[in-house]
Amino acid sequence: MSDAVSITGEFMPARLARQLLSIQAQNQQTTRLDGWFLIQEIRMHALQALRASETDHPNVIVQAKLFTAVCAQLTLTIRPDEIFAGTQDDAFARTYALINPEFRVETFAGYCDPMAVYGDITPAPELGLSAERIERVRDFWAHEPFAQALREAYAGTGAELAEVAYFTEQVTGHTVADFRPALQYGLLPLIDAARSGAQEHTGARRDFYLAAEIALHAALTIGDRYAHLAAEMAKEEADPIRKSELERIAYTAGCVLRRGATTLYEAMQAFILLWMAMALEQSPNPYAFSVGNLDRILQPYYEQHAIEREVAVELTRQLLALFNVGDRNWAISQNIMVGGRDVQGNDLTCAMTYIILNAFYRSNYPQPALSVKIHAGTPDAVYAALEPFFITPGSLTPSFFNDDVLFPLLARKGIAQQDWPLYAIAGCQEPLIMGKESENTTNSWLNLGKILELTLHGGKSAISGKRIGLSYEELGLDPQQPIRDMAQMKAAFWKQLDGLLPRMEAAANACTRAMALLPIPFLSCFMGGLDSGVDLRDVTAQGTPYNASGCLIHGLSVVADSLAAIHTLQQTSPEALAELPRALLANFDGVEALRQRCLSAPKYGNHLALPDQLAAEIVAGVSRRVYGLRNPWGNPFLPDWSTPSTHLLYGYWVGATPDGRLARQMLNYGIDPSAGMATHGLPPRMLSMHTLPYQEMLGGYASHLGLEPGMLQAAGERGFITALREFVIDPLFGFTGGTGGYYVYFNIDSAQHLREILARPKELVPSGIYIMRIHGTFVNFLDLSPAIQEDIITRLDAQSTRLVGKAQRA
């Protein structure tokens, strides 16, 4: 067969592979992302025109009309070699700090200022983007109600937010839409449902249904415009093969959103157009939109119209290219899942599971993230398909989620049994129900290290000296000797935390109410809105079946180890307790012997009774307190023990702590031991982690294992993945009996090798791409800032994951 694509729709794998290389090369040359600004400008003009018309529309309809203007006016392109129409590039700016080489822990201030994005666009007079034009748009939106509401939300937080005792933010993205009905039937039935809803309801619900109909029609406009563009390009195309490809794009883009898909190609094209519309609606920077089980979504179309497996792999690689935004993959933390089981324990692996895994392995790009659902009955063939990821240096390594533990956790959250298999990951590791759950996942962030510091110093910051928390007297401590024993300090810690949590709750809810000023009727149609008649962001009623707000909790092992150190000093050298507050304020300067005693105290991660019990107690106590907070819907905040590189940022604002950690050093990552503190090897580390109450971590948690490349090869000759299962996955997840966790990700490399790569990148990585993980997402190690590169190297922490370790109980 020739290297061609026929009018009837045959694809040639070799051509598809070459086209993908061309697309990736074009991405690498895309150093400007200006579409988001043009979207803001289109919205500005549309809003000004609406106001000039003197027609008073409800806000949800206003937002639908602004979305319509964007879909109708934004410039569309089909680049050379693209076989699908659609992009999410225009939704993102060159903003995400952790993949920006200019990122500095010392100066990062979060994403709470919606006007900060305008600092991420460089004026380009040759493109018509003058500084004056940028400022005009920025100034317009700075005076709109949303920006004003956010400023008011942050106005009362002061030093407690500036020094991150807690942090709050408005949440965009971080959602898993259910596009399956639109893929199968098209948008016309949804439009009919919206129209019927408007006829059957009055008031706010009628307004929503009217807005939904407008927004769904706007998405059809995108498909129609691409169809027209592709048809016009086909008329001018001399190459018959490319002409045929453009004609296919024109035909499919023009009809698939109306009638639904019947082939794998059509399903992918429909998905891309829907994804584009969803991203445009929340531009700029809707981070962590995620897909769910892509294998289950696409399997019906693979079965319905048979194609060669190799063609399916290459088409999937083309689909994955949607998630590669610009030269640094700026659309961060977009997650795709495969695998898993149903509620009866039956494995749900299908042909598309293996096709998607193969596509990811061949492409090996920083985005999107890949997560694999596993369980005790996961087939050996799935593990065999995963092995290449783990034995290839610089290859992405999927994260694992344990259905056997997650299903009971979902039950505790109040999720109906039939919805358990629908859980998906919104971004890094937060489990949500596809199409049914709005969790506002990154709404609040809690810094236990700072809470401990404020407790130790009577409410004053060890960094700035500012009064932030409760005083010694309010905590019931003696100002002359506040640290007398562990029990007293622990009680004071809880009291300090209880004093700050209501303030965090209020600030987080203010951000959520601000977001309600920007309804998203298009996405809401795929999140239960057509059933409820309520926008996903509406705080006056609940639009999704499941709703919560998130709280990401930092500093578990720092606090546990610090309390253990206080207890150890109490037992061995009680006179040192009187000296400890001054030593901490001095960053242990001049008292190195005291610091060494603190460092030598028992540490979480070594299977030692005291710190392990303290860690479990902290998880339970903090989680229950966070769960007791309420969002604007009256639903709980879900405790999420995840620290998406923020363990660096939050540690920078924490002074020295009794575990021996110096001021401004990073906190521990997620639920992992502090770097360098788990010295007894992997088995004791896992035993420590088994003591944690995972069922209290209703919002998720983060955990990372850094493995030396040769470690598991030395464990046996049965293959790397077999050894990984036997020595790591099965015991960690409880597949061999006992309790277990439900999430882990790996980096398989050595600190020495990564430092060599940094020293000689062109020689050792000629492709310029070397994939590692930071929290729940892949990154190109060479694109990162020095601070993040060093964090990855430090947390490989080989001594904590060596297989031969002594387990002991103190």
Task: List PLM regions with ranges.
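Conserved catalytic cores of very large enzyme subunits
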Residues: 2-212, 241-809
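Extended non-globular scaffold/tether segments
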Residues: 210-221
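Extended amphipathic alpha-helical scaffold segments
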Residues: 223-231, 295-299
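Short, Lys/Glu-rich amphipathic helical modules
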Residues: 230-246
